[in-house]
C-alpha cells in the first residue's frame, strides 16, 4: 500500500498535494443528482447517498501506515491536528459540491470510519475526544449544511465507549452494532 505520509515531517505534510477537487467530473455528480431526484420524486424508496470522501481516521492510517499514524497520535499531536486540518480542507470542497447536488433528494447519507477493534477503540476515549472528535464533528456539521438527510456512520469493532461522542458529533444512525464486539 502506498503510504505517502509515513514518517513525513510537518513541513512535508504541509507541502503534500491532496487531489484537486476541481478535477471531479461534474457530469458524474449531476448524473447522481438526477437519479436521486428521479427516485425521490417518483418512488417511496428511502434514498441513501454514500459519503463521497473517506473517513478522517482511516485516511490517516492509509496515508501514514497504521502504526505510524497511531504513534503520531500518541507522540505528535501538532502533526495530527495539522493532518486533520488539511484533510478537512480538502474534504469540505468535495462535500460542498456533492451534497449541493444530491443533498435535497436523499433521506440519509452513509459514511464509514473504523474506530475500533473487536474489543475496544483503537485509541482511548480521551484521545479520541481530543484528537479525532473535533474534526469528525466538524465534517458532519459541514455535510449537514447541504442536506437535511440523517447521518449514518459505519464503524467496525466495539465502539460502545464512543457512542455518546458519536451522537454528540451528529451521528443519527450507527452501523453496525456488532453483537460479539
Locate predicted features:
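Active-site loop segments of alpha/beta catalytic cores
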Residues: 2-181
Amino acid at each position: 500500500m502506498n503510504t505517502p505520509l509515513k514518517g513525513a515531517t510537518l513541513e512535508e505534510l504541509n507541502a503534500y498535494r491532496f487531489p484537486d477537487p476541481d478535477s471531479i467530473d461534474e457530469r458524474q455528480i449531476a448524473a447522481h443528482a438526477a437519479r436521486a431526484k428521479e427516485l425521490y420524486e417518483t418512488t417511496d424508496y428511502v434514498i441513501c447517498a454514500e459519503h463521497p470522501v473517506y473517513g478522517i481516521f482511516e485516511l490517516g492510517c492509509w496515508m501514514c501506515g497504521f502504526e505510524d499514524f497511531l504513534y503520531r497520535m500518541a507522540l505528535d499531536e501538532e502533526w495530527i491536528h495539522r493532518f486533520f486540518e488539511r484533510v478537512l480542507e480538502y474534504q469540505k470542497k468535495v462535500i460542498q459540491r456533492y451534497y449541493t447536488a444530491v443533498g435535497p433528494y436523499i433521506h440519509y447519507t452513509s459514511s464509514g470510519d473504523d474506530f475500533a477493534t473487536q474489543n475496544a477503540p483503537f485509541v482511548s476515549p480521551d484521545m479520541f475526544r481530543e484528537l479525532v472528535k473535533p474534526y469528525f464533528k466538524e465534517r458532519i456539521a459541514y455535510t449537514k449544511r447541504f442536506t437535511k438527510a440523517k447521518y449514518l456512520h459505519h464503524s467496525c469493532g466495539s465502539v460502545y465507549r464512543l457512542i455518546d461522542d458519536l451522537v454528540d458529533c451528529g451521528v443519527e444512525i450507527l452501523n453496525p452494532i456488532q453483537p460479539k464486539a
